Amino acid sequence: MHRASHHELRAMFRALLDSSRCYHTASVFDPMSARIAADLGFECGILGGSVASLQVLAAPDFALITLSEFVEQATRIGRVARLPVIADADHGYGNALNVMRTVVELERAGIAALTIEDTLLPAQFGRKSTDLICVEEGVGKIRAALEARVDPALTIIARTNAELIDVDAVIQRTLAYQEAGADGICLVGVRDFAHLEAIAEHLHIPLMLVTYGNPQLRDDARLARLGVRIVVNGHAAYFAAIKATYDCLREERGAVASDLTASELSKKYTFPEEYQAWARDYMEVKE
């Protein structure tokens, strides 16, 4: 069986963006899940930053994972992947120069596309954990990412959060990233189709939507007409794996069945309340 090169996988992802359809990602978090996703016919996968933090550190999504740790996991996936994989590269692990290093390392790992978001990460002293960087810095990061890539087929996607700012600010940011040369725009926190339409009508590059299964955004044909090519529903496969592991080990120990959900198990073993308390105590981070 022919195994596509990393460049060929990137070209395959570009073809998805150039199509008129909407595709749903598989959540891939290790080589086995990447192989399963490809075998089941998924057109692309995504290595989420939150999932990588759970898989590598058993830690919540507080920007604790390092670039090296993330790249190591991406490399393991890239070694066996037979489908294009998107890397959720968070904020690029620092400033614009750090973004350049991030692009170099993830390209070498075999990633087909990556997202760079404009959230102020990691959380800063005395600031809200949901604050965004200024548009100018976000533009600088996208320009730096484009400069750093060697394979022109590698897709650079600018990500912003439509839930944290008003629609005019979202339009301002996404237009700026589009003008800076981003290959696509990733939107998180879109409420419904009216919200999406207000943003999408100003853009001419492909859209990626993180919906977390939002029932208000489940019409794939309508999404496709608005320019959405990639949809991320979340990472149910990973959390199902946590639940299955817990239940299996409980059974091996002779324990009675548990009714804890996958989400509850994740919180039970990653201690998010402790991290939140440390952020308040040592950094005066505002909720």
From Swiss-Prot:
Its EC number is 4.1.1.112. Keywords: Decarboxylase, Lyase, Magnesium, Metal-binding. One of its GO terms (molecular function) is magnesium ion binding. Belongs to the isocitrate lyase/PEP mutase superfamily. Oxaloacetate decarboxylase family. It is an enzyme of class 4 (lyase). It comes from Pseudomonas paraeruginosa (strain DSM 24068 / PA7). It comes from the Bacteria. The keyword Chloroplast does not apply. Catalyzes the decarboxylation of oxaloacetate into pyruvate. Seems to play a role in maintaining cellular concentrations of bicarbonate and pyruvate. Mg(2+) binds at D88. Pfam families: PEP_mutase. Its cofactor is Mg(2+). GO terms for biological process: oxaloacetate metabolic process; propionate catabolic process, 2-methylcitrate cycle; pyruvate biosynthetic process. Binds 1 Mg(2+) ion per subunit. InterPro entries: ICL/PEPM, Oxaloacetate_deCOase_bac, Pyrv/PenolPyrv_kinase-like_dom, Pyrv_kinase-like_dom_sf. This is Oxaloacetate decarboxylase. It catalyses: oxaloacetate + H(+) = pyruvate + CO2. Substrate binds at S50, R159, H235. Homotetramer; dimer of dimers.
